[in-house]
A protein has these predicted regions:
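Alpha-helical multi-pass membrane helix bundles of inner-membrane/thylakoid proteins
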Residues: 2-5, 76-77, 88-127, 168-186, ...
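Membrane helix-loop-helix hairpins that form the core translocation module of multi-pass transporters
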Residues: 40-110, 165, 172, 193
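Juxtamembrane boundary at the C-terminal end of a transmembrane helix
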Residues: 8, 193-200
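Hydrophobic alpha-helical transmembrane segments of multi-pass membrane transport proteins
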Residues: 144-167
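Hydrophobic/aromatic residues within the transmembrane alpha-helices of Major Facilitator Superfamily
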Residues: 17, 21, 55, 91, ...
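Juxtamembrane transmembrane-helix termini in multi-pass membrane transport proteins
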Residues: 3-73, 128-147
C-alpha cells in the first residue's frame, strides 16, 4: 500500500460507515422485520443481505475494472426493479392482513439477496467508495479486493445494529403497530422515490 492510500483509508472508513449506518432499504427492512416478528427471522434475512452485499461489491469492482458499459446499460432496469421491489415491501407493511413477515413476504436468505442486488444505492455507494478513496492510489488488484470487500463487512455489521435496535423497539411496536408500519412504509417509499429520482 502506498502512503497516499494509507492516508486516504480513514476517510474511506468514515464514508463507508456513514453510508452503511444511515437508513436505506436493507436497514429499514431489517429493523421492521425484527420489530414485527423477531430477531431470528431478521438474522436469516441478514445472511441474504450480506451475500447480496458481497455480490454487489464484486459487480462494482468488475465495473470499475473494465465492464463499465455493461453495468451502465443495466443500471436503469436495475433501478426500476429495485424501486418496484422496495415499493412492494412498503405496501406489504401496511396492507390489511396479519401474515408473517411483511404480510406474506418471508424474511428469507433469498429475499435478502434480492433486496441487495436490486439496491442501486448500494452499487453507487460501493463504486463511489472505491473511485474516491482507493483507485486513485493503487492499481493492485489484491489491495483493491481487500479494501473493497471491507465495505460489505462494515455494511453487514451496521445492518446488525439495526436488527438489534429493533429488538429494543419490539414492545413499543406492539403498542403502536399501525403508525409504526405506516412510518416504516413511508420511509421505504421515500427510498424508492430516491432511487427513481436518480434516473431523471
Amino acid at each position: 500500500m502506498t502512503p497516499a492510500l494509507v492516508a486516504a483509508l480513514p476517510a474511506f472508513a468514515l464514508y463507508t460507515f456513514i453510508q452503511a449506518i444511515t437508513p436505506g432499504p436493507a436497514n429499514l427492512c431489517s429493523l421492521a422485520t425484527t420489530m414485527r416478528i423477531g430477531v431470528r427471522p431478521a438474522l436469516r434475512q441478514w445472511v441474504g443481505l450480506t451475500i447480496g452485499f458481497f455480490v454487489v461489491m464484486a459487480v462494482a469492482m468488475a465495473a470499475l475494472l473494465g465492464a463499465t458499459s455493461l453495468i451502465e446499460g443495466a443500471l436503469p432496469a436495475l433501478t426500476v426493479a429495485g424501486a418496484a421491489y422496495v415499493l412492494w415491501l412498503a405496501w406489504s407493511m401496511v396492507r390489511p392482513g396479519e401474515g408473517q413477515g411483511f404480510n406474506g413476504v418471508q424474511p428469507t436468505i433469498g429475499a435478502g439477496v434480492v433486496l441487495q442486488v436490486t439496491n442501486v444505492k448500494l452499487l453507487v455507494m460501493s463504486s463511489t467508495a472505491l473511485v474516491a478513496y482507493v483507485i486513485p492510489y493503487t492499481s493492485d488488484l489484491a489491495v483493491l479486493a481487500a479494501i473493497g470487500f471491507a465495505v460489505p463487512i462494515v455494511g453487514s455489521a451496521c445492518n446488525l445494529a439495526w436488527i438489534y435496535g429493533g429488538v429494543h423497539l419490539q414492545a413499543f411496536y406492539e403498542r403502536h403497530r399501525r403508525p409504526v408500519d405506516a412510518i416504516m412504509a413511508a420511509a421505504l417509499a421515500l427510498c424508492a422515490v430516491g432511487m427513481l429520482a436518480a434516473l431523471v
